[in-house]
Amino acid sequence: MSQKKSPRFELRSGNVDALLLALQTADMAALRDDLLARFEATPDFFSNDVIALDLRALEDDSEVALGTVIETLATLRARAIGVVARPGQREWAERFGLPLLDSQARRGSGADRATDRAAEARAAAAAEQAAADQAAREESIRAAAQATTDAAVAAAIRQTQTMLIDKPLRSGQQVYAQGDVVILDVVSYGAEVIAEGNIHIYAPLRGRALAGVKGNTGARIFSTCMEPELISIAGIYRTAEQTLPADVLGKTAQVRLADEKLILEALRLK
């Protein structure tokens, strides 16, 4: 075999930095669950780090299923590159296709402790960031819920405010009520009454009446003399071109919405 040095490669001795995962249990299913519980929420913790599996804390005859922990590490974006084992463990450890590594450090040495502290610091920082992100999400949800509640309360207050008008509405006049409106005099031709709630007219309605204008399909229009130019509830309207039923025209009646159709009914007051 030629001993001539090749210009295309060079073999050197060197050290490769790797995390050492010291296994403290032979229960690989439990170990998998612990690893996932600790690191799954922070998928960038390992960031393609290489890891050596330290088996020296296990019994020589444990013969653990290292495939489980190797697959779990791969899920967490880490790669097992070898095992550190005692002589009595090497025969079964080699079955998983990982090379046997010599560790210059002893368990409990300063180097191991420094590595452990670095790993703990990274895990703590990742957990702190995850907790901060969760707190921010919860605060956003609380703020949105509070805004929705405030809007609902404001809407309820508006709806409880009833406008009262005791003068006739002349042609060209318009009133707008954020809740219900009660009118005690005539609404003339050309006048317009608009309300987010109900419209009560204890006089002839000859102009236009639009109730539930913000989409309140439960709003109604009442009049003691129903002769409108136009009636509308939640945007569904009817004009004077459509003749009112005889029992409604000029009578005490109400208008309501059912299945997106205007229903006109005479009121028989007792």
Curated annotation (Swiss-Prot):
Pfam families: MinC_C, MinC_N. InterPro entries: CAP/MinC_C (IPR016098), MinC (IPR013033), MinC_C_sf (IPR036145), MinC_N (IPR007874), Septum_form_inhib_MinC_C (IPR005526). The keyword Cell division applies. It comes from the Bacteria. Keywords: Cell cycle, Cell division, Septation. GO terms for biological process: cell morphogenesis; division septum assembly; regulation of cell division; regulation of cell septum assembly. The keyword Signal does not apply. Belongs to the MinC family. Interacts with MinD and FtsZ. Cell division inhibitor that blocks the formation of polar Z ring septums. Rapidly oscillates between the poles of the cell to destabilize FtsZ filaments that have formed before they mature into polar Z rings. Prevents FtsZ polymerization. HAMAP family: MinC (MF_00267). This is Probable septum site-determining protein MinC. It comes from Cupriavidus necator (strain ATCC 17699 / DSM 428 / KCTC 22496 / NCIMB 10442 / H16 / Stanier 337) (Ralstonia eutropha). The gene is minC.
